[in-house]
UniProtKB/Swiss-Prot annotation:
Keywords: Acyltransferase, Cytoplasm, Transferase. This is Aspartate/glutamate leucyltransferase. The keyword Acyltransferase applies. One of its GO terms (molecular function) is leucyl-tRNA--protein transferase activity. It holds the Pfam family ATE_C. It comes from Xanthobacter autotrophicus (strain ATCC BAA-1158 / Py2).
Length: 249
């Protein structure tokens, strides 16, 4: 039996399961483990190749006869918010995001429970316990952080922190070429703020300030209404069999 070096990634294929995005379809994924000293560099390479991270696993779709899942990344330097995006930024100008280590809290979990119950109903993520949530946040061997969003405090111009209730949270990986938004959640009762849109816009701003060219959004799934929002952030690049291709409109 041949042996592989410990730091050489091994890839595996999942069994078929129902597709969560397209009714009547089945999905399969190819995945590997992100562990060890080279986990961060491997995560960089795999993300650039269309993989996503979930805890210490990197995966990408490997479905037979279906190519609906397309990796999308926003071109930060050339992105200019249109009128609707500027309105969202204005509506949330009273919020401030504070970077936190990838450490779960009970306050985060309470907001997460409210979000998944309101958005996803039952099953899947709605069944996640506090331990499951903790694993989602802290089971990482790469450069992962949280951004917590609250209303600005009276001294936020001097000390960048907010006060009051937690409004939104973004779990984000910092890559060599961008920010990868792993998972985000927010107060589902606040409809007029478009908080999901605001989190993406804020990460575009953060990536630009860090000198990073991309914000990775994961997969746009052609034919899935709940994933269609990812097409709005232009210009963007979509991963094809021929590499990343720029989309302007």
């Amino acid at each position: 039996m041949s042996e592989h070096p410990r730091d050489t990634p091994q890839f595996y294929l999942t069994a078929p399961s129902p597709c969560p995005y397209l009714p009547g379809r089945e999905e399969r994924k190819v995945f590997t483990h992100l562990v060890g000293d080279k986990a961060a560099s491997l995560n960089d390479v795999l993300t650039q190749g269309g993989f996503r991270r979930s805890q210490s696993i990197a995966y990408r779709p490997a479905c037979e006869g279906c190519k609906a899942c397309v990796s999308v990344r926003i071109c930060v330097d050339d992105f200019t918010p249109g009128r609707s995006f500027r309105r969202v930024q204005a509506d949330n100008s009273d919020l401030i995001g504070q970077i936190k280590p990838a450490t779960p809290t009970s306050e985060q979990y309470a907001l997460f429970r409210s979000y998944v119950t309101g958005r996803h109903g039952t099953g899947g993520m709605a069944d996640m316990s506090v331990l499951d949530y903790a694993m989602m946040v802290e089971d990482t061997h790469v450069h992962t952080r949280l951004v917590e969003y609250r209303k600005r405090g009276p001294d936020s111009r001097i000390i960048p922190r907010g006060t009051g209730d937690l409004m939104a949270v973004a779990l984000t990986d910092v890559l060599t070429d961008g920010l990868s938004m792993v998972y985000s959640f927010y107060n589902p009762q606040v409809h007029d703020r478009s908080l999901g849109t605001f989190l993406i816009l804020d990460h575009i701003t953060r990536a630009r300030q860090m000198g990073l060219p991309y914000v990775y959004l994961g997969y746009w799934v052609q034919g899935s209404r709940k994933m269609d929002y990812k097409r709005r952030y232009l210009p963007q690049e979509r991963l094809t069999p021929h590499g990343w291709e720029r989309v302007e409109k």
